[in-house]
Amino acid sequence: MELCHSNQLKIGLKIIYNNEPCIVVSNEFIKPGKGQAFFRVRLKNLLNKKLIDKTCKYSDCFKIANVIEITATYMFTDKKVWTFMDKKSFEQIFVEKNIIKNVLPWLLEQHDYIISLWNDQPISIVYSSNFIELIVVNTIPNARSGAINTYSKLALLNTGVTIKVPIFIQIGQIIKVDTRTSEYISKIS
């Protein structure tokens, strides 16, 4: 396994810290008026998403994590395990609910997702794009009559997620949604 020193920790580098994969969020060189220089490093744990602040000496070494990202197509689920197919090797990848929970509202068969693997085990999954096109299955008018903001209503989408949409959106129309914020972007058709 490859090693790197504190001064080689660049933003985005994936390393092993406390036997878990982490990504470097920031690395600041500090030269105090008195004493030895050091690095103030901020890491994000890739398994539990917690931020870690660490002070390192120049001589501190870290192992580079074997984290790879692959593009895979969602195939099917049995409600316990979600099955994806690697687009390059055509191997099946099995993802458990605790890993897939953040992308469940946007999960559609035959769509591509980016899966991060650490030691050949999935640790995270994201939609391959920041935007997704979904079909409006049902709309619920704004329940508060006389409300100041009556420019939006709730819409149930074909993945089961409910979001706010403009009042002109009808059942059966296709809309573009931002997967990061769960917000309506535009009407497609």
From Swiss-Prot:
The keyword Protein biosynthesis applies. It is found in: Cytoplasm. The modification N6-(3,6-diaminohexanoyl)-5-hydroxylysine is found at residue 34. GO terms for cellular component: cytoplasm. Pathway: Protein biosynthesis; polypeptide chain elongation. Pfam families: EFP (PF01132), EFP_N (PF08207), Elong-fact-P_C (PF09285). GO terms for biological process: peptide biosynthetic process. May be beta-lysylated on the epsilon-amino group of Lys-34 by the combined action of EpmA and EpmB, and then hydroxylated on the C5 position of the same residue by EpmC (if this protein is present). Lysylation is critical for the stimulatory effect of EF-P on peptide-bond formation. The lysylation moiety may extend toward the peptidyltransferase center and stabilize the terminal 3-CCA end of the tRNA. Hydroxylation of the C5 position on Lys-34 may allow additional potential stabilizing hydrogen-bond interactions with the P-tRNA. GO terms for molecular function: translation elongation factor activity. CDD domains: S1_EF-P_repeat_1, S1_EF-P_repeat_2. Signal peptide: none annotated. The keyword Cytoplasm applies. Keywords: Cytoplasm, Elongation factor, Hydroxylation, Protein biosynthesis. NCBIfam families: efp, PRK00529.1. Belongs to the elongation factor P family. Involved in peptide bond synthesis. Alleviates ribosome stalling that occurs when 3 or more consecutive Pro residues or the sequence PPG is present in a protein, possibly by augmenting the peptidyl transferase activity of the ribosome. Modification of Lys-34 is required for alleviation. This is Elongation factor P.
